[in-house]
Amino acid sequence: MRTPSFPQAAAELILAGPVGPLEVVVDPPKADVTPQPVVAIVCHPLSTEGGTLHNKVVTMAATALRELGLTTVRFNFRSVGGSAGTFDHGTGEQDDLKAVAAWVRAELPQHRLWLVGFSFGAFVSLKAAADLQPEALVSIAPPAGRWDFSGIVPPANWLVIQGEQDEIVDPQAVYDWLEDIQAPHTLVRM
């Protein structure tokens, strides 16, 4: 499979992933803002519970980042939409994220990388952050208590966003986990 060039306009692409094609959507910054040399890869929630790159929180996060002048890349983890493979409980999904990040860095070496994840996507991006070394990490409703968060070393520039009335991710479990790991972070409670 030929590796596509990074598009200048909004585009849907297929990348070669670790176990086959990965479905990717690239969106440039909003037209009325100054573009920043940053690409934010936004990761979706649990695929076995319907998570896709089209998830409402994922698309809203990408839109907010584009309004700040960032280019966004959303993709489907293995087994979702046009992405090949089978669900791998976060391990293979980290490989998918690393493949997308490698493509971004090869195509736009002058750009900085941010990782953004919602729920399961927050778990995957947190686990991959040590290897990918993003400039910033944004974790929206990280599912503490639902997945093994041991060994996670977030970057210094880490934003955690947690809804106080979240019905899926227990807010107190997130707050307790943040206190236990004692990693520098900014917490936004909504």
Regions found by a protein language model. Give the residues of each.
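Catalytic histidine neighborhood in serine/cysteine hydrolases
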Residues: D180-M190
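Alpha/beta-hydrolase active-site loop
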Residues: V57, F87-L108
